[in-house]
Amino acid sequence: MKHLAIGALAARHALHARGEALARAAFYIAILLVLSRLWHALGAGSSYVWYVALTEWVTLAMPLISVEIEEDIRRGDIAYRIARPVSYLWTKVAEGFGSGLVRLMIIGGAGGVAAWILTGGPPPRGVLLSLPLATLAFFLLVLWQTAIGLSAFWIGDTQPFFWIWQKLLFMLGGLLFPLEIYPEWLQRVAYCTPFAPLLHGWARLAFDPDPALAAKTLLLLLGWGVALTAFLVWLYRRALAVMDVNGG
């Protein structure tokens, strides 16, 4: 319950300080304008514009938890934050998810209207089917960001890890292009990674609204979510051990 309250508080703060979300929304609309023209030039249908609208929506709403954790460690604030009775790890997750939900609503509202105008029609029914899965995928992205932030206990600067992870997400997750247009060997590689269900798995419902596909994506997200949560808990315990050894 404490972490639900923390997430709700972070959401209220994000709602009051919504300038950043509005700036991201403006950038999002600009991206949609460019990419919609690209897809139309390639002769693709409007459902592909909605696909990109979905993947970019979740990506642009991501909170930069890794930067926040890195700053806590660099400033030395981490010692007293960890000493609090509420878990630092799940506090950061709750804050990131709470503030991220506000960005999802603001950016999604603006982008949904823009995509509707650019495609000349309402979203395909698969878009509505994808929204619950998008929320679950977004939660997993928050967990990834937290794990990258914890790496600062060992490497100090998390930017190299974040850069590599981001590029893998963009390429193997199918940020700009559905995996179906990739070479077959690259498709097989992507489907073996956690990145494919994070973006492509649910966003492709925009042009393939198959309930069986949605169910498969749900199972993949849940499976990778369990594995990622276990890894995150293990990593956090190792980080606490590093603090104890260093006299933190």
Annotate the PLM regions.
Residues 1-248:
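Hydrophobic transmembrane alpha-helices and immediately adjacent juxtamembrane helices
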